[in-house]
Amino acid sequence: LQHIMDTSKEMHEWGNNHKQIIDMSDELLRKAKVQGFSDFQIARAIGYEGDMEDGILYVRNHRKQVGILPVVKQIDTLAAEYPAQTNYLYLTYSGVANDVKYLGDHKSIVVLGSGAYRIGSSVEFDWCGVQALQTIRKEGYRSVMINYNPETVSTDYDMCDRLYFDELTFERVMDILELENPHGVIVSTGGQIPNNL
């Protein structure tokens, strides 16, 4: 935790002395991403002035220009006892290569899940997501789900071709969409969170 606090302080100090993110060292930006800082948190830490949605894009565009991109890793469901080949995936900045190959053939469709259950959002949205995944497969496309709720049917290993067990935020969803290069994205089956994106 001390390293994270030190990085936050370093970004705040940097932001007090500079105005443009292009002046920030790639090393500091990479360290912040490896430690889990979102583009929003980085924009806020450096004192970005203006609309925060613009701030997120400001950091994102610079990060992509300098090659600071997440990689996709498979979740090891076998505790390293055997090599695991799963369709359970997550994104991280602590890696150098993707564990899966991307075809870029526009033959996949991404469904955004509902995330955690809460008042007004429960299994009915998961049912909608599962129905969408099944229909996508019937139509001959690869089905891709982004959801972080382990209690849902849509996160079962056999429900989709790829499951990104990751947060439903603009930054993370865009990272996945840029990798998948899908034919389409379905946001309407997950409730308010994906609709707000």
Feature map (PLM): residue ranges:
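ATP-dependent carboxylate/acyl-activation modules
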Residues: 1-197
